[in-house]
Amino acid sequence: NLNIGLNDHGLVSDFYFPDNAYENHTLDKNMFHKIGVRVDNKLSWLDDEGWKFSFEYFEDGLISRTTAINQSLQIKLESKDAVLYDKDALLRAVKVTNLVDYNREVAIFLHQNFAINSSKHLADTAQFIPDHPAILHYRGKRAFVVAAQILSQVSSTHHEWQSYDQHTVGLFGIENKEGSWRDAEDGELAGSNVEHGQTDSVIRFKTNLEPHQVAQIQYSIACA
C-alpha cells in the first residue's frame, strides 16, 4: 500500500499511501524530505550544489541505492532504500564516510516534510514522542511515525544502536517560515516538541569519525 518516489538527489519527493493513484502526502516536486551533513562548520543539503550522484536499483529485492559525494566537504553519503513487502514502512540504511585522513565531528540531519492528503490546509500535527523516541506526523486517519538510530561505539569492544541526539518540529509556508530544516544551519536544533499547521520535522545525529570511518544510521517511516 506504500509507494515512495525519489527525486534526482535521492530524496523522498512522493509518498503515496494507501492508494498509489490518489493519496500522495506531498504537495509538489519542490516539497521533499531533505538530508544534510555538517562538517568543519559547513552544512550542505543533498539538494545543494557540490554533490555528485550515482544510482543503482536492485530489481530482485526492490531496493535502490543512492551514492552522493561532496568533494569540497570530503564526505560520502550512501542510502539504501526499500519498502517492506509485508508492512507499510519505508526503510533507509544511511552510511556517511569521512574521506579525509584526520578525525572530524560530523552531524547528519534527516528532515521530514509531509502535506497529509496533499492538503495545504493548516491541519497537520507534528509531535515528538519521547518514550520511543519518535516523531509522529498525523492528520485525521493518517499517521506517519519516524524513527532512527545510529550505531555507536560505547566501549573498545562493544557497539550499540542509539537514538538521535536532537530533534525539532516546525512550520513552513506561513509567516515567511521555510521550515524547521532552517534551524539546522547553525548545527543545533531548538528541540520544539509539537506544532500544528503546515508542519515539518528534523532529527540530528552527531558523531566523531576517524579517517575513512563510516557512520551507520537505520531510519524508518511507518504508516497507518
PLM region spans:
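An extended acidic
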Residues: N1-I69, A147-G179
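Short Pro/Gly-enriched beta-strand edge/turn motifs at strand-loop
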Residues: L43-G50, L73-E78, D186-G191
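Polysaccharide-binding surfaces and accessory modules of carbohydrate-active proteins
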Residues: S64-I69, L73-R182, S201-I203
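Primarily extracytoplasmic ectodomains and periplasmic/lumenal surface modules that are beta-strand-rich
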Residues: L11-S13, D101-E105, A224
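Edge strands and adjacent loops of beta-rich recognition modules
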Residues: S54-R65, A184, L189-G197
